[in-house]
């Protein structure tokens, strides 16, 4: 089983329906707040079930949800097919999109599932698809020194505030015996220092890489903003 197989099937990464709903609502609110303008074209890469994507769609001109798992794409189309400015695509379809067509690319809680030799071509694709001056946000990046205990503590705090604390306790126990735990042991999760991810993003051709507030409930994970070089203005004759 690969990470794509895991997300393509039934899993228990969320401890309850309420956990899932609150998680996706928080992420959607954070993405919507980052949208640069009402007419912006936004790509959400590795969006998962994106239960509150309508909040993002209402904040921008065009929202493109990219998801590698085909079963998740089917759910997204069934849920959001009525929204004229929202489309659902595969990673392969992103590669076929016109260059210089996006204002914002968001990859939240994604790059930990990519090896470095997978992340590098992804960065190149995102750079090509962004308009000059467009923004890339990498969120929920895991630093090498982040303890699983810290992640668990942040989840329990989110659960306490969100009203699913008992379910979260049970979910943490189930995770020990889950496919997620086995896959994490087999494949690991990619971690990056701030210096390391900055170097990778700059090497891909982005400029102005800076730390920003993370998306979601866990402030111990990192987020970064970077931009495609703006086209220089032609000199006035």
Question: Where are the language model's segments positioned?
Answer:
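A conserved beta-strand element that flanks and buttresses the S-adenosyl-L-methionine
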Residues: 106
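Structural signature of beta-strand start/N-cap positions in the alpha/beta core
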Residues: 41, 62, 101-103
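Class I (Rossmann-like) S-adenosyl-L-methionine-dependent methyltransferase catalytic domain
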Residues: 1-35, 39, 49-85, 90-96, ...
